[in-house]
């Protein structure tokens, strides 16, 4: 969920797990995935941070445990070393990334709220991973513009994960396409946006879901016709679209 988004209003949850964001129609099936595949193999540091984040009032902003596992595996498969994350919150996905990178791997992490990042920082430090993270507080676009202006940064990132303000996803993509290497990946989170991407125009949606829905739809349409990337939209968490740069 976006770093700038409102906290969700209290209502009966479809799943009991914090940050579930699952689009599966069966609670039992999602619980089966968590208990069979995710929780038994979840690193102790990720479990600790997940439980700490569960106590935060905006805990639905966190990356779900199954998506964290997916990202960790993906980064290992592509042998990622130099990465970027836009939208950090308490750092659950950041920790999943740091665990997957080699000891000299790097993550340029950006978020408008350092206070949230510092909730998870002690866990990251205890895991011996803080040296991999370069955290920058503030809006991402000005920093991205600085990076793009220097051509030595072009094509240097193996993986970039975006889980921030949906109304800027298109603006991020315009810049990130130059920074990710050919063959590298950009992952855009929440691209199914609570399932609202297929909801009727008059559907009763929460205010923040309705507000960001059009921006998510705009991104999805743009990625579908962008010849510079190959894409794969996956129903993991709240939907993640992987873009592999080909030119």
Swiss-Prot record:
Q: Which reaction does it catalyse?
A: (E)-caffeoyl-CoA + S-adenosyl-L-methionine = (E)-feruloyl-CoA + S-adenosyl-L-homocysteine + H(+)
Looking up Gene3D superfamilies in the UniProt record yields: Vaccinia Virus protein VP39
- Describe how the cofactor binds: Binds 1 divalent metal cation per subunit.
Q: Which residues bind a divalent metal cation?
A: 163, 189-190
Q: Does the keyword Secreted apply?
A: no
Q: Which residues bind substrate?
A: 21, 163, 194
The alphabetized list of GO BP terms reads:
lignin biosynthetic process; methylation
Q: What family is it from?
A: Belongs to the class I-like SAM-binding methyltransferase superfamily. Cation-dependent O-methyltransferase family. CCoAMT subfamily.
Function of the protein: Methylates caffeoyl-CoA to feruloyl-CoA and 5-hydroxyferuloyl-CoA to sinapoyl-CoA. Plays a role in the synthesis of feruloylated polysaccharides. Involved in the reinforcement of the plant cell wall. Also involved in the responding to wounding or pathogen challenge by the increased formation of cell wall-bound ferulic acid polymers.
Q: What is this protein called?
A: Caffeoyl-CoA O-methyltransferase 2
Which species? Answer: Eucalyptus globulus (Tasmanian blue gum)
Per the record, the gene is CCOAOMT2
């Amino acid at each position: 969920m976006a770093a700038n988004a409102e906290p969700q209003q209290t209502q009966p949850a479809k799943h009991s797990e914090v940050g579930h964001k699952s689009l599966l129609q069966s609670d039992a099936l999602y619980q089966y995935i968590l208990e069979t595949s995710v929780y038994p193999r979840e690193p102790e540091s990720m479990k600790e941070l997940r439980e700490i984040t569960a106590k935060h009032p905006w805990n639905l902003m966190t990356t779900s445990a199954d998506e964290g596992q997916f990202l960790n595996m993906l980064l290992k498969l592509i042998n990622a070393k130099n990465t970027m994350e836009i939208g950090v919150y308490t750092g659950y996905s950041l920790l999943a990334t740091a665990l997957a990178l080699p000891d000299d791997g790097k993550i340029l992490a950006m978020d408008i709220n350092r206070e949230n990042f510092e909730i998870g920082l002690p866990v990251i430090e205890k895991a011996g991973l803080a040296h991999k993270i370069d955290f920058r507080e503030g809006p991402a676009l000005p920093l991205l513009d600085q990076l793009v202006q220097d051509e030595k940064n072009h094509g240097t990132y193996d993986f970039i994960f975006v889980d921030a303000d949906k109304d800027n996803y298109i603006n991020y993509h315009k810049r990130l396409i130059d920074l990710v290497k050919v063959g590298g990946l950009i992952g855009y989170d929440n691209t199914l946006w609570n399932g609202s991407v297929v909801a009727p125009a008059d559907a009763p949606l929460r205010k923040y879901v309705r507000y960001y829905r059009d921006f998510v739809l705009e991104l999805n349409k743009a990625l579908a016709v962008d010849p510079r990337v190959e894409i794969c939209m996956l129903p993991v968490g709240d939907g993640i679209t992987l873009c592999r740069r080909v030119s």
